[in-house]
C-alpha cells in the first residue's frame, strides 16, 4: 500500500468473556472474528504469562496485535515458580506456551488446549478426570492464539489418545476450528480420533447467574466431552 513496509506497533486491548453477570452485551468472546486477518496477531492474557514482557515483545515487532483479556482474570494472581497447587505444576519450556500437568508433561492420555480465560475450568476438568476417571491430562495454554505455535507441540500431541480444544466462544469459525485444522493437517495419519472441540451453547448470554452457567462452557462440559471421546 505504501510501497514499503511501515512499522505499526499497536496493541488493541479487548476485554472478553462471561461469568460475571454482565449480560449479552458485555460477555462475548470475540476472538474468532479476527482470525485470519493478514498481519494481525492475536494474543490472550493468562495467569502463566507476564503481561509486561509479553506486551513489550509484541510492540517490538512493529506489527498490529489484539490482546484479549478475559475479565475473570482481573482479580486473580499469576502462578509463579512452576507451581499451580498441590496437584499441578507447570513449565514454560516452549516459548509462549505454558504446559500444566499433574505427573509428566510429555506423557498424558489427553492434551487439552485452552486459552487463558478458561484455564481455571480446564484445570478443574483435568483434576476431575484424574481423580475420578484416572485419565491424565496436560493443559496447553498459549499466549499467542494466532498464528498458533503448533510445531513445538507436535511431539506431545502425537502421543495423546485425545486432543481437546476448549474455548468460551460459540461454535462456528472459531479459534479452535483453526487450530484443529492445523493439527489434522499435520497429524491425521497418527491420530486415533479427530480433535474434540468444546464450546459454549449457541445462545445470547443471560445476566442471571444460573442461566449464564447453563449457556457458557463449564469444567463439566470439558470433562464429559473428553470422557465421551475416550469411550467412543
Identify what each model region corresponds to.
Residues 5-11, 19, 71-72, 76-232:
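Thiamine diphosphate
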Residues 39-42, 49-87:
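Helix-enriched interaction subdomains in cytosolic or periplasmic regions
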Residues 37, 61-62, 132, 160:
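Acidic-histidine catalytic/liganding microenvironments
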Residues 3-61, 230:
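Conserved thiamine diphosphate
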Residues 34, 65, 181-185:
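Domain-wide signal for the mature, well-folded portions of proteins, strongly enriched
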Amino acid at each position: 500500500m505504501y510501497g514499503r513496509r511501515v512499522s505499526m506497533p499497536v496493541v488493541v486491548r479487548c476485554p472478553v468473556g462471561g461469568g460475571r453477570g454482565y449480560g449479552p452485551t458485555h460477555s462475548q468472546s470475540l476472538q474468532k472474528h479476527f482470525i485470519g486477518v493478514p498481519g494481525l496477531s492475536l494474543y490472550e492474557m493468562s495467569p502463566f504469562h507476564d503481561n509486561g514482557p509479553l506486551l513489550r515483545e509484541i510492540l517490538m515487532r512493529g506489527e498490529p496485535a489484539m490482546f484479549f483479556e478475559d475479565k475473570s482474570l482481573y482479580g486473580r494472581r499469576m502462578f509463579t515458580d512452576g507451581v499451580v497447587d498441590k496437584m499441578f505444576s507447570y513449565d514454560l519450556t516452549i516459548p509462549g506456551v505454558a504446559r500444566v500437568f499433574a505427573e509428566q508433561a510429555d506423557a498424558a492420555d489427553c492434551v487439552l488446549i485452552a486459552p487463558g480465560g478458561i484455564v481455571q475450568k480446564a484445570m478443574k476438568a483435568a483434576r476431575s478426570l484424574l481423580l475420578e476417571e484416572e485419565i491424565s491430562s496436560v493443559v496447553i495454554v498459549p499466549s499467542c492464539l494466532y498464528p498458533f505455535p503448533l510445531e513445538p507441540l507436535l511431539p506431545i500431541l502425537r502421543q495423546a489418545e485425545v486432543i481437546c480444544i476448549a474455548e468460551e466462544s460459540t461454535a462456528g469459525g472459531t479459534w479452535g476450528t483453526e487450530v484443529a485444522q492445523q493439527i489434522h493437517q499435520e497429524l491425521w495419519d497418527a491420530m486415533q480420533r479427530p480433535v474434540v472441540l468444546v464450546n459454549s451453547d449457541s445462545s445470547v448470554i443471560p445476566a442471571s447467574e444460573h442461566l449464564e452457567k447453563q449457556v457458557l462452557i463449564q469444567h463439566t462440559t470439558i470433562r464429559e466431552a473428553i470422557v465421551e471421546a475416550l469411550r467412543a
